[in-house]
Protein backbone atom coordinates (compact mmCIF):
# COMPACT_ATOMS: atom_id res chain seq x y z
CA UNK A 1 0.00 0.00 0.00
CA UNK A 2 1.03 3.61 -0.51
CA UNK A 3 1.18 5.87 2.52
CA UNK A 4 2.58 9.28 3.29
CA UNK A 5 6.01 9.89 4.75
CA UNK A 6 6.47 13.37 6.19
CA UNK A 7 10.02 14.71 6.16
CA UNK A 8 10.80 18.01 7.86
CA UNK A 9 14.13 19.77 7.88
CA UNK A 10 15.27 22.79 9.84
CA UNK A 11 17.80 25.36 8.68
CA UNK A 12 19.41 26.48 11.95
CA UNK A 13 20.55 29.83 10.55
CA UNK A 14 17.13 30.94 9.32
CA UNK A 15 14.86 28.75 11.49
CA UNK A 16 12.93 27.95 8.32
CA UNK A 17 11.21 24.58 8.32
CA UNK A 18 10.88 22.63 5.10
CA UNK A 19 8.38 19.83 4.72
CA UNK A 20 7.86 17.20 2.08
CA UNK A 21 5.20 14.58 1.66
CA UNK A 22 6.01 11.37 -0.17
CA UNK A 23 4.02 8.35 -1.17
CA UNK A 24 6.14 5.31 -0.42
CA UNK A 25 5.10 1.78 -1.27
CA UNK A 26 5.60 -0.80 1.46
CA UNK A 27 4.37 1.15 4.48
CA UNK A 28 1.22 0.09 6.32
CA UNK A 29 0.55 3.47 7.97
CA UNK A 30 1.81 7.03 7.94
CA UNK A 31 5.31 7.74 9.24
CA UNK A 32 6.79 11.08 10.24
CA UNK A 33 10.51 11.78 9.95
CA UNK A 34 11.75 14.97 11.57
CA UNK A 35 15.25 15.88 10.46
CA UNK A 36 16.80 18.24 13.02
CA UNK A 37 19.43 20.93 12.51
CA UNK A 38 22.24 18.36 12.89
CA UNK A 39 20.77 16.14 10.20
CA UNK A 40 19.61 13.48 12.67
CA UNK A 41 16.39 11.70 11.74
CA UNK A 42 13.72 11.39 14.43
CA UNK A 43 11.40 8.70 13.11
CA UNK A 44 7.84 8.36 14.44
CA UNK A 45 5.90 5.30 13.30
CA UNK A 46 2.69 3.61 14.42
CA UNK A 47 4.11 0.09 14.30
CA UNK A 48 7.41 -1.78 14.38
CA UNK A 49 7.49 -2.79 10.71
CA UNK A 50 7.03 0.79 9.52
CA UNK A 51 9.60 2.06 12.03
CA UNK A 52 12.41 -0.06 10.63
CA UNK A 53 11.23 0.37 7.05
CA UNK A 54 11.61 4.12 7.62
CA UNK A 55 15.03 3.72 9.27
CA UNK A 56 16.27 1.78 6.25
CA UNK A 57 14.75 4.26 3.82
CA UNK A 58 16.20 7.32 5.57
CA UNK A 59 19.64 5.79 6.13
CA UNK A 60 19.91 4.74 2.48
CA UNK A 61 18.86 8.23 1.44
CA UNK A 62 21.63 9.74 3.58
CA UNK A 63 24.39 7.18 2.92
CA UNK A 64 23.63 5.56 -0.44
CA UNK A 65 27.21 5.17 -1.68
CA UNK A 66 28.34 3.84 1.69
CA UNK A 67 25.48 1.35 1.50
CA UNK A 68 26.48 0.19 -1.97
CA UNK A 69 30.12 -0.37 -0.99
CA UNK A 70 28.95 -2.31 2.09
CA UNK A 71 26.65 -4.42 -0.11
CA UNK A 72 29.46 -5.24 -2.51
CA UNK A 73 31.85 -6.06 0.33
CA UNK A 74 29.27 -8.35 1.91
CA UNK A 75 28.29 -10.14 -1.31
CA UNK A 76 31.77 -10.53 -2.80
CA UNK A 77 31.10 -8.33 -5.84
CA UNK A 78 33.75 -5.60 -5.52
CA UNK A 79 35.71 -6.96 -8.52
CA UNK A 80 32.61 -6.38 -10.65
CA UNK A 81 33.16 -2.61 -10.37
CA UNK A 82 36.90 -2.33 -9.59
CA UNK A 83 38.45 -5.14 -11.62
CA UNK A 84 40.68 -8.19 -11.07
CA UNK A 85 42.74 -6.63 -8.27
CA UNK A 86 39.70 -7.16 -6.03
CA UNK A 87 39.17 -10.81 -6.95
CA UNK A 88 41.03 -12.10 -3.87
CA UNK A 89 38.77 -9.99 -1.67
CA UNK A 90 35.62 -11.38 -3.27
CA UNK A 91 36.88 -14.95 -2.92
CA UNK A 92 37.60 -14.36 0.77
CA UNK A 93 34.22 -12.75 1.32
CA UNK A 94 32.36 -15.67 -0.19
CA UNK A 95 34.53 -18.15 1.70
CA UNK A 96 33.63 -16.55 5.04
CA UNK A 97 29.96 -15.86 4.34
CA UNK A 98 27.39 -17.09 6.84
CA UNK A 99 25.80 -20.17 5.29
CA UNK A 100 23.54 -21.33 8.11
CA UNK A 101 19.77 -21.11 8.50
CA UNK A 102 18.77 -17.51 7.78
CA UNK A 103 15.61 -17.52 9.94
CA UNK A 104 17.53 -18.75 13.00
CA UNK A 105 20.15 -16.12 12.27
CA UNK A 106 17.74 -13.19 11.96
CA UNK A 107 15.74 -14.13 15.06
CA UNK A 108 18.90 -14.35 17.18
CA UNK A 109 19.18 -10.57 17.20
CA UNK A 110 15.63 -9.95 18.43
CA UNK A 111 12.55 -12.14 19.03
CA UNK A 112 11.08 -10.44 15.94
CA UNK A 113 14.43 -10.10 14.20
CA UNK A 114 13.21 -11.52 10.90
CA UNK A 115 10.42 -8.94 10.68
CA UNK A 116 12.69 -6.08 11.76
CA UNK A 117 15.57 -6.85 9.40
CA UNK A 118 13.30 -7.64 6.45
CA UNK A 119 11.41 -4.37 7.03
CA UNK A 120 14.71 -2.48 7.17
CA UNK A 121 15.81 -4.06 3.88
CA UNK A 122 12.45 -3.20 2.29
CA UNK A 123 12.99 0.42 3.29
CA UNK A 124 16.51 0.46 1.84
CA UNK A 125 15.23 -1.06 -1.40
CA UNK A 126 12.30 1.35 -1.57
CA UNK A 127 14.71 4.28 -1.66
CA UNK A 128 17.02 2.56 -4.16
CA UNK A 129 14.11 1.88 -6.53
CA UNK A 130 13.02 5.50 -6.15
CA UNK A 131 16.42 7.03 -6.93
CA UNK A 132 16.96 4.70 -9.91
CA UNK A 133 13.95 6.33 -11.58
CA UNK A 134 15.98 9.55 -11.70
CA UNK A 135 19.59 8.32 -12.05
CA UNK A 136 20.82 11.84 -12.73
CA UNK A 137 20.17 12.48 -9.02
CA UNK A 138 22.50 9.70 -7.86
CA UNK A 139 25.31 10.91 -5.57
CA UNK A 140 28.47 11.95 -7.41
CA UNK A 141 30.60 8.87 -6.53
CA UNK A 142 28.21 6.65 -8.51
CA UNK A 143 28.69 8.85 -11.57
CA UNK A 144 32.46 8.88 -11.11
CA UNK A 145 32.58 5.08 -11.11
CA UNK A 146 29.82 4.64 -13.67
CA UNK A 147 27.77 2.35 -11.42
CA UNK A 148 24.29 2.21 -9.91
CA UNK A 149 23.14 0.95 -6.50
CA UNK A 150 21.56 -2.48 -6.39
CA UNK A 151 18.92 -4.01 -4.15
CA UNK A 152 19.61 -5.48 -0.72
CA UNK A 153 18.67 -8.76 0.96
CA UNK A 154 18.73 -9.66 4.68
CA UNK A 155 21.98 -11.54 3.99
CA UNK A 156 23.65 -8.19 3.25
CA UNK A 157 22.67 -6.82 6.66
CA UNK A 158 24.09 -9.79 8.59
CA UNK A 159 27.46 -9.73 6.79
CA UNK A 160 30.56 -10.52 8.87
CA UNK A 161 33.01 -8.47 6.79
CA UNK A 162 33.47 -5.63 9.28
CA UNK A 163 34.02 -5.06 12.99
CA UNK A 164 35.07 -8.61 13.82
CA UNK A 165 38.14 -7.74 15.85
CA UNK A 166 39.62 -11.13 14.98
CA UNK A 167 42.95 -12.31 16.33
CA UNK A 168 43.81 -15.20 14.03
CA UNK A 169 46.64 -13.18 12.49
CA UNK A 170 48.24 -12.81 15.92
CA UNK A 171 47.96 -16.57 16.47
CA UNK A 172 49.84 -17.17 13.23
CA UNK A 173 52.49 -14.59 14.16
CA UNK A 174 53.00 -16.20 17.57
CA UNK A 175 53.24 -19.61 15.91
CA UNK A 176 55.87 -18.33 13.49
CA UNK A 177 57.84 -16.75 16.33
CA UNK A 178 57.76 -19.98 18.33
CA UNK A 179 58.92 -21.89 15.24
CA UNK A 180 61.91 -19.54 14.95
CA UNK A 181 63.06 -18.98 18.54
CA UNK A 182 61.05 -21.28 20.80
CA UNK A 183 58.19 -20.77 23.21
CA UNK A 184 60.18 -19.56 26.23
CA UNK A 185 61.95 -16.81 24.28
CA UNK A 186 58.63 -15.68 22.78
CA UNK A 187 57.16 -15.43 26.28
CA UNK A 188 60.09 -13.23 27.29
CA UNK A 189 59.51 -10.89 24.35
CA UNK A 190 55.69 -10.78 24.43
CA UNK A 191 53.45 -9.88 27.35
CA UNK A 192 51.03 -12.67 28.23
CA UNK A 193 48.96 -11.78 31.28
CA UNK A 194 47.65 -12.61 33.79
CA UNK A 195 48.21 -16.32 33.00
CA UNK A 196 51.14 -18.29 31.61
CA UNK A 197 49.67 -19.84 28.44
CA UNK A 198 50.97 -22.92 26.65
CA UNK A 199 52.33 -21.78 23.28
CA UNK A 200 54.59 -24.69 22.29
CA UNK A 201 53.81 -25.99 18.81
CA UNK A 202 52.49 -29.53 18.52
CA UNK A 203 55.10 -31.78 16.89
CA UNK A 204 52.69 -32.43 13.99
CA UNK A 205 52.77 -28.76 12.91
CA UNK A 206 54.87 -28.21 9.77
CA UNK A 207 56.92 -25.18 10.85
CA UNK A 208 57.99 -24.27 7.31
CA UNK A 209 54.38 -24.08 6.08
CA UNK A 210 53.59 -21.52 8.80
CA UNK A 211 55.59 -18.99 6.79
CA UNK A 212 53.41 -19.45 3.71
CA UNK A 213 50.54 -17.00 3.12
CA UNK A 214 48.05 -19.35 4.75
CA UNK A 215 45.55 -16.65 5.77
CA UNK A 216 45.50 -14.74 2.47
CA UNK A 217 41.71 -15.02 1.86
CA UNK A 218 40.96 -13.98 5.45
CA UNK A 219 43.02 -10.80 5.24
CA UNK A 220 41.90 -10.02 1.68
CA UNK A 221 38.21 -9.81 2.48
CA UNK A 222 38.67 -7.64 5.56
CA UNK A 223 40.82 -4.93 4.00
CA UNK A 224 39.59 -1.46 3.13
CA UNK A 225 38.24 -0.75 -0.35
CA UNK A 226 40.75 1.53 -2.08
CA UNK A 227 39.86 3.55 -5.15
CA UNK A 228 42.40 4.17 -7.91
CA UNK A 229 42.41 6.49 -10.89
CA UNK A 230 41.74 3.65 -13.34
CA UNK A 231 38.51 2.82 -11.50
CA UNK A 232 37.00 6.15 -12.57
CA UNK A 233 35.32 7.02 -15.82
CA UNK A 234 37.80 8.90 -17.99
CA UNK A 235 36.02 12.23 -17.66
CA UNK A 236 36.63 12.15 -13.88
CA UNK A 237 40.29 11.14 -13.91
CA UNK A 238 41.88 14.17 -12.30
CA UNK A 239 43.44 15.03 -8.95
CA UNK A 240 40.36 16.72 -7.53
CA UNK A 241 38.20 13.69 -8.28
CA UNK A 242 40.59 11.29 -6.60
CA UNK A 243 40.83 13.48 -3.51
CA UNK A 244 37.03 13.51 -3.27
CA UNK A 245 36.51 9.82 -3.86
CA UNK A 246 39.27 8.76 -1.50
CA UNK A 247 37.33 10.24 1.38
CA UNK A 248 35.56 6.89 1.20
CA UNK A 249 38.71 4.83 1.57
CA UNK A 250 38.24 4.37 5.31
CA UNK A 251 34.69 3.03 5.13
CA UNK A 252 35.66 -0.27 6.73
CA UNK A 253 38.64 0.85 8.76
CA UNK A 254 38.21 0.17 12.46
CA UNK A 255 40.66 1.79 14.87
CA UNK A 256 39.17 0.39 18.04
CA UNK A 257 42.62 -0.90 18.89
CA UNK A 258 43.59 2.72 19.58
CA UNK A 259 41.63 2.49 22.81
CA UNK A 260 38.03 3.19 23.74
CA UNK A 261 36.80 4.30 27.14
CA UNK A 262 33.51 4.35 29.03
CA UNK A 263 32.21 4.84 32.55
CA UNK A 264 29.04 4.89 34.62
CA UNK A 265 28.69 6.80 37.89
CA UNK A 266 26.11 6.23 40.62
CA UNK A 267 23.93 9.04 41.94
CA UNK A 268 25.82 9.27 45.24
CA UNK A 269 28.81 10.53 43.24
CA UNK A 270 27.00 13.23 41.23
CA UNK A 271 25.85 16.74 42.10
CA UNK A 272 22.25 16.19 41.01
CA UNK A 273 21.89 12.64 42.29
CA UNK A 274 21.39 11.11 38.85
CA UNK A 275 23.37 8.26 37.33
CA UNK A 276 25.60 9.18 34.40
CA UNK A 277 27.00 7.21 31.46
CA UNK A 278 29.79 8.39 29.16
CA UNK A 279 31.38 6.60 26.21
CA UNK A 280 34.03 7.48 23.63
CA UNK A 281 34.48 4.52 21.28
CA UNK A 282 37.56 5.32 19.22
CA UNK A 283 36.78 4.81 15.56
CA UNK A 284 38.45 5.99 12.39
CA UNK A 285 37.44 9.49 11.38
CA UNK A 286 35.93 8.96 7.94
CA UNK A 287 33.60 10.61 5.47
CA UNK A 288 30.91 9.41 5.63
CA UNK A 289 31.06 8.58 9.33
CA UNK A 290 31.27 5.00 10.57
CA UNK A 291 28.37 5.82 12.90
CA UNK A 292 24.84 6.88 12.06
CA UNK A 293 22.72 8.79 14.57
CA UNK A 294 18.97 8.23 14.71
CA UNK A 295 15.93 8.41 16.99
CA UNK A 296 13.41 5.57 16.67
CA UNK A 297 9.89 5.92 18.10
CA UNK A 298 7.00 3.44 17.79
CA UNK A 299 4.90 1.42 20.25
CA UNK A 300 7.49 -0.39 22.39
CA UNK A 301 10.37 1.67 20.95
CA UNK A 302 11.84 5.03 21.97
CA UNK A 303 15.60 4.94 21.54
CA UNK A 304 18.18 7.46 20.32
CA UNK A 305 21.89 7.16 19.71
CA UNK A 306 24.51 5.98 17.25
CA UNK A 307 24.78 2.75 15.33
CA UNK A 308 26.30 1.17 12.28
CA UNK A 309 24.74 2.93 9.25
CA UNK A 310 23.86 -0.30 7.46
CA UNK A 311 22.05 -2.18 10.24
CA UNK A 312 18.76 -1.49 12.05
CA UNK A 313 18.59 -0.29 15.63
CA UNK A 314 20.95 1.69 17.87
CA UNK A 315 24.29 0.34 19.15
CA UNK A 316 25.12 3.03 21.72
CA UNK A 317 22.46 5.29 23.17
CA UNK A 318 19.57 5.60 25.58
CA UNK A 319 15.85 5.00 25.87
CA UNK A 320 13.33 6.26 28.46
CA UNK A 321 14.76 3.95 31.12
CA UNK A 322 18.53 3.72 30.76
CA UNK A 323 21.67 4.41 28.76
CA UNK A 324 24.42 2.06 27.57
CA UNK A 325 27.81 2.17 25.93
CA UNK A 326 30.66 -0.12 24.93
CA UNK A 327 34.39 -0.62 24.69
CA UNK A 328 36.30 -3.58 23.30
CA UNK A 329 36.67 -6.69 25.50
CA UNK A 330 38.94 -8.82 23.37
CA UNK A 331 37.77 -12.41 23.08
CA UNK A 332 39.54 -15.19 21.18
CA UNK A 333 36.88 -16.69 18.93
CA UNK A 334 39.13 -18.06 16.17
CA UNK A 335 41.53 -20.98 15.83
CA UNK A 336 43.77 -22.17 13.00
CA UNK A 337 43.82 -25.91 12.22
CA UNK A 338 46.36 -27.84 10.11
CA UNK A 339 45.17 -30.88 8.13
CA UNK A 340 46.79 -33.68 6.20
CA UNK A 341 45.33 -33.93 2.68
CA UNK A 342 44.77 -37.47 1.44
CA UNK A 343 47.61 -38.06 -1.09
CA UNK A 344 45.29 -40.41 -3.01
CA UNK A 345 42.31 -38.04 -2.99
CA UNK A 346 42.87 -34.28 -2.67
CA UNK A 347 39.19 -33.80 -1.80
CA UNK A 348 39.73 -35.48 1.57
CA UNK A 349 41.47 -34.45 4.79
CA UNK A 350 42.35 -36.33 7.95
CA UNK A 351 40.69 -35.49 11.25
CA UNK A 352 41.27 -37.54 14.37
CA UNK A 353 42.76 -40.32 12.23
CA UNK A 354 39.81 -40.56 9.83
CA UNK A 355 39.61 -39.33 6.21
CA UNK A 356 36.75 -36.87 5.71
CA UNK A 357 35.48 -35.13 2.57
CA UNK A 358 35.96 -31.41 2.12
CA UNK A 359 32.72 -29.60 1.41
CA UNK A 360 33.20 -27.86 -1.94
CA UNK A 361 31.12 -24.91 -3.16
CA UNK A 362 31.57 -23.45 -6.64
CA UNK A 363 30.99 -19.74 -7.20
CA UNK A 364 31.16 -17.50 -10.25
CA UNK A 365 32.53 -14.03 -9.56
CA UNK A 366 31.97 -11.22 -12.09
CA UNK A 367 35.11 -9.22 -12.89
CA UNK A 368 35.18 -5.81 -14.54
CA UNK A 369 37.10 -5.88 -17.82
CA UNK A 370 37.35 -9.65 -17.97
CA UNK A 371 35.54 -12.96 -17.98
CA UNK A 372 33.72 -14.12 -14.84
CA UNK A 373 35.98 -16.12 -12.55
CA UNK A 374 34.90 -19.60 -11.49
CA UNK A 375 36.26 -20.50 -8.05
CA UNK A 376 36.03 -23.46 -5.69
CA UNK A 377 35.59 -22.83 -1.98
CA UNK A 378 36.66 -25.60 0.40
CA UNK A 379 35.39 -26.22 3.92
CA UNK A 380 36.41 -28.66 6.61
CA UNK A 381 34.08 -29.48 9.50
CA UNK A 382 35.90 -26.72 11.41
CA UNK A 383 35.24 -24.05 8.81
CA UNK A 384 36.63 -22.21 5.76
CA UNK A 385 39.83 -23.60 4.23
CA UNK A 386 42.25 -20.72 3.61
CA UNK A 387 45.24 -22.69 2.30
CA UNK A 388 45.78 -25.91 0.33
CA UNK A 389 49.20 -27.27 -0.62
CA UNK A 390 48.67 -30.43 -2.64
CA UNK A 391 52.42 -30.90 -3.14
CA UNK A 392 52.99 -31.24 0.61
CA UNK A 393 49.44 -32.51 1.25
CA UNK A 394 48.75 -29.87 3.90
CA UNK A 395 45.73 -27.61 4.32
CA UNK A 396 44.70 -24.97 6.84
CA UNK A 397 41.21 -23.93 7.93
CA UNK A 398 39.87 -21.35 10.37
CA UNK A 399 37.25 -22.16 12.97
CA UNK A 400 35.31 -18.94 13.62
CA UNK A 401 32.86 -18.53 16.48
CA UNK A 402 31.34 -15.64 14.54
CA UNK A 403 30.12 -17.99 11.82
CA UNK A 404 27.65 -19.36 14.37
CA UNK A 405 24.16 -17.77 14.32
CA UNK A 406 24.40 -14.34 15.91
CA UNK A 407 27.82 -13.40 14.55
CA UNK A 408 26.87 -10.14 12.83
CA UNK A 409 28.61 -7.26 14.64
CA UNK A 410 26.45 -5.02 16.87
CA UNK A 411 23.11 -6.27 15.52
CA UNK A 412 22.06 -7.80 18.86
CA UNK A 413 21.83 -4.20 20.13
CA UNK A 414 18.24 -4.46 18.92
CA UNK A 415 17.49 -6.35 22.15
CA UNK A 416 19.24 -3.71 24.28
CA UNK A 417 17.25 -0.90 22.66
CA UNK A 418 14.07 -2.01 24.46
CA UNK A 419 15.59 -2.83 27.87
CA UNK A 420 13.75 -1.21 30.79
CA UNK A 421 15.78 -2.64 33.69
CA UNK A 422 19.30 -3.86 34.41
CA UNK A 423 17.99 -7.43 34.35
CA UNK A 424 16.51 -6.96 30.89
CA UNK A 425 19.67 -5.27 29.65
CA UNK A 426 21.86 -8.08 31.00
CA UNK A 427 19.58 -10.65 29.36
CA UNK A 428 19.90 -8.74 26.05
CA UNK A 429 23.68 -8.84 26.46
CA UNK A 430 23.66 -12.65 26.43
CA UNK A 431 22.81 -12.49 22.71
CA UNK A 432 25.71 -10.14 21.88
CA UNK A 433 28.20 -12.58 20.34
CA UNK A 434 30.29 -10.20 18.24
CA UNK A 435 32.36 -8.21 18.91
CA UNK A 436 33.66 -8.82 22.42
CA UNK A 437 32.65 -5.71 24.36
CA UNK A 438 32.41 -4.16 27.79
CA UNK A 439 28.74 -3.16 27.93
CA UNK A 440 27.87 -0.61 30.61
CA UNK A 441 24.44 0.51 31.84
CA UNK A 442 23.02 3.38 33.90
CA UNK A 443 19.30 3.80 34.55
CA UNK A 444 16.83 6.25 36.06
CA UNK A 445 16.26 3.96 39.05
CA UNK A 446 19.85 4.58 40.13
CA UNK A 447 21.46 1.35 38.94
CA UNK A 448 24.84 1.09 37.24
CA UNK A 449 26.13 -2.14 35.73
CA UNK A 450 28.75 -3.80 33.56
CA UNK A 451 28.54 -6.99 31.51
CA UNK A 452 31.33 -8.30 29.30
CA UNK A 453 29.97 -9.86 26.11
CA UNK A 454 31.28 -11.83 23.14
CA UNK A 455 31.17 -15.48 22.14
CA UNK A 456 34.05 -17.36 23.79
CA UNK A 457 35.00 -20.97 22.97
CA UNK A 458 35.89 -23.26 25.87
CA UNK A 459 39.28 -24.88 25.18
CA UNK A 460 40.39 -27.59 27.58
CA UNK A 461 43.62 -28.72 25.90
CA UNK A 462 45.18 -25.60 24.42
CA UNK A 463 45.52 -21.85 24.77
CA UNK A 464 44.22 -20.97 21.31
CA UNK A 465 47.28 -18.78 20.77
CA UNK A 466 49.08 -20.90 18.15
CA UNK A 467 48.03 -23.08 15.18
CA UNK A 468 47.15 -26.68 16.07
CA UNK A 469 46.83 -29.94 14.13
CA UNK A 470 43.39 -31.41 13.47
CA UNK A 471 44.18 -34.62 15.32
CA UNK A 472 41.20 -34.45 17.67
CA UNK A 473 43.17 -33.18 20.68
CA UNK A 474 42.37 -29.51 20.23
CA UNK A 475 38.61 -29.28 19.82
CA UNK A 476 36.32 -26.71 21.41
CA UNK A 477 34.08 -27.84 24.26
CA UNK A 478 31.06 -25.62 23.56
CA UNK A 479 30.91 -21.89 24.37
CA UNK A 480 31.09 -20.06 27.68
CA UNK A 481 27.65 -18.64 28.58
CA UNK A 482 28.01 -14.87 28.20
CA UNK A 483 26.36 -14.33 31.59
CA UNK A 484 29.43 -16.03 33.12
CA UNK A 485 31.78 -13.42 31.69
CA UNK A 486 32.86 -10.62 34.07
CA UNK A 487 30.06 -8.37 35.29
CA UNK A 488 29.10 -6.05 38.13
CA UNK A 489 26.00 -4.32 39.49
CA UNK A 490 26.04 -1.28 41.77
CA UNK A 491 29.58 -1.72 43.15
CA UNK A 492 30.30 -0.13 46.51
CA UNK A 493 32.81 2.30 44.98
CA UNK A 494 29.94 3.98 43.08
CA UNK A 495 31.38 3.83 39.57
CA UNK A 496 32.49 1.43 36.84
CA UNK A 497 35.04 2.29 34.15
CA UNK A 498 36.41 0.22 31.27
CA UNK A 499 39.22 1.30 28.98
CA UNK A 500 41.56 -0.07 26.33
CA UNK A 501 44.23 2.60 26.59
CA UNK A 502 47.35 1.70 28.55
Predicted stretch roles:
Residues 242-336:
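NTP-handling and nucleic-acid-processing catalytic cores
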Residues 7-9:
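C-terminal motif of bacterial Sec signal peptides marking the signal peptidase cleavage site
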Residues 44, 52-54, 160-161, 273-274, ...:
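Short helix/loop capping segments that flank catalytic or ligand/cofactor-binding pockets
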Residues 377-411, 425, 434:
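Targeting-peptide/extracellular-domain and disordered-appendage signature
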Residues 312, 394, 434-502:
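Hydrophobic alpha-helical segments
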Residues 33, 409-431:
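Alpha/propeptide regions of enzymes that mature by internal proteolysis
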Amino acid sequence: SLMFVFILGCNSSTQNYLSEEKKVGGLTDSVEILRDEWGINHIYANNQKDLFFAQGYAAAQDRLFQFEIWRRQSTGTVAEILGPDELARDIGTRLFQFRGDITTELNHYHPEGKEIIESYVQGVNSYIKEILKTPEQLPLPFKMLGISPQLWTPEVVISRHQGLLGNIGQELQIGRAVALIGAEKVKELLWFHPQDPEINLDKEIDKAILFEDILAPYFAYRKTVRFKEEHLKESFRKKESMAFLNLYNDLSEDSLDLGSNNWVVAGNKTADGNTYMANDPHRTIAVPSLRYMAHLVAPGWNVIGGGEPEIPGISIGHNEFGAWGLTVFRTDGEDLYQYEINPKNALQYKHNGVWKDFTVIEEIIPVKGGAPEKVRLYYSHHGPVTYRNEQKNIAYAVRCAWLEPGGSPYLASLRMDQAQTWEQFQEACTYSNIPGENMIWADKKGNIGWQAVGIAPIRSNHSGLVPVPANGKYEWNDYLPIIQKPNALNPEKGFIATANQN
